[in-house]
From Swiss-Prot:
<protein>
    <recommendedName>
        <fullName>CD-NTase-associated protein 15</fullName>
    </recommendedName>
</protein>
<comment type="function">
    <text>Protects E.coli against phage infection. When the CBASS operon (cdnB-cap15) is introduced in E.coli MG1655 there is about 100-fold protection against phage T2 and about 10-fold protection against phage T5 and T6.</text>
</comment>
<keyword id="KW-1133">Transmembrane helix</keyword>
<comment type="similarity">
    <text>Belongs to the CBASS Cap15 membrane effector family.</text>
</comment>
<keyword id="KW-0812">Transmembrane</keyword>
<keyword id="KW-0051">Antiviral defense</keyword>
<dbReference type="GO" id="GO:0000166">
    <property type="term" value="F:nucleotide binding"/>
</dbReference>
<feature type="region of interest" description="Required for cell toxicity">
    <location>
        <begin position="1"/>
        <end position="73"/>
    </location>
</feature>
<dbReference type="InterPro" id="IPR041208">
    <property type="entry name" value="Cap15"/>
</dbReference>
<feature type="transmembrane region" description="Helical">
    <location>
        <begin position="43"/>
        <end position="63"/>
    </location>
</feature>
<dbReference type="GO" id="GO:0005886">
    <property type="term" value="C:plasma membrane"/>
</dbReference>
<keyword id="KW-0997">Cell inner membrane</keyword>
<comment type="function">
    <text>Effector protein of a CBASS antivirus system. CBASS (cyclic oligonucleotide-based antiphage signaling system) provides immunity against bacteriophages. The CD-NTase protein (CdnB) synthesizes cyclic nucleotides in response to infection; these serve as specific second messenger signals. The signals activate a diverse range of effectors, leading to bacterial cell death and thus abortive phage infection. Causes cell death in response to 3',3'-cGAMP upon coexpression in E.coli with V.cholerae DncV; inactivating DncV prevents cell death.</text>
</comment>
<comment type="subunit">
    <text>The beta barrel domain oligomerizes; in the presence of cyclic nucleotides (probably 3',3'-cGAMP, but the cognate CD-NTase makes at least 4 other cyclic nucleotides) higher-level oligomers are detected.</text>
</comment>
<dbReference type="GO" id="GO:0051607">
    <property type="term" value="P:defense response to virus"/>
</dbReference>
<feature type="transmembrane region" description="Helical">
    <location>
        <begin position="15"/>
        <end position="35"/>
    </location>
</feature>
<dbReference type="Pfam" id="PF18153">
    <property type="entry name" value="Cap15_CD_rec"/>
</dbReference>
Length: 194
């Protein structure tokens, strides 16, 4: 979820340093390993612990206070609603899934025309201290018409309106049929399924 990036530097580096020192002293003093081996074992141990915690264990320690003050939990199934400038205001509703961990966030969904994926997602703090989900996506159009394209990309920026319900609203834009001046943009809303 790139939550790691939202941590204040003092906390981020303080926790890493304290855990590294404890692990190093464990190998050096308790197990009696030489200094270089203790350093090597410490690096390996910290890497493994960070991976396990960042991918799996963080969910069990992520309390509501952290969701409100640090970063919301974006994991789950969502309903996306877009209102596009295409053909005078096309409205589309589609399901999507967000998978997030401490270090990354990915999205995938099925639209009325095909599939959409997003591997570049980032959670940022806006100027007003609210949370925003910013991402780039690609869409594979399984049934393109003669005036459409089979693949296009886009970007979106959504503001978390309410952390408890995880409702988000924002804007999107695409390069869909840009060669013909028909690229699209509009409003997007995401609502988390309960």
């Amino acid at each position: 979820m790139r939550m790691w990036e939202l941590l204040p530097s003092k906390i981020k580096y303080g926790i890493s340093t304290i855990i590294s020192i404890i692990v190093f002293l464990f190998f050096l003093e308790f197990l009696g390993q030489p200094v270089l081996k203790s350093v090597s074992y410490t690096i390996t141990t910290i890497t493994i612990l960070a991976f396990i915690f960042g991918k799996y264990l963080w969910k069990y320690f992520y309390i509501d206070y952290l969701k409100h003050k640090f970063c919301p939990d974006f994991n789950g199934r969502w309903i996306g609603k877009i209102e596009s400038n295409y053909s005078g205001g096309t409205k589309v509703e589609f399901p999507l899934e967000i998978k997030a961990d401490f270090f990354s966030i990915k999205m995938k969904g099925n639209t009325t025309i095909g599939r959409t994926y997003s591997n570049y997602c980032k959670v940022v703090r806006a100027e007003d201290d609210s949370f925003e989900l910013v991402y780039m996506f690609k869409v594979f159009n399984d049934t393109p018409s003669i005036t459409d394209t089979s693949f296009y990309e886009g970007a979106a920026r959504l503001r978390v309106i309410d952390i408890k319900t995880m409702n988000m609203k924002g804007v999107f834009w695409t390069n869909r049929c840009w060669e013909n001046g028909k690229n699209t943009a509009g409003i997007i809303e995401l609502s988390k399924e309960v």
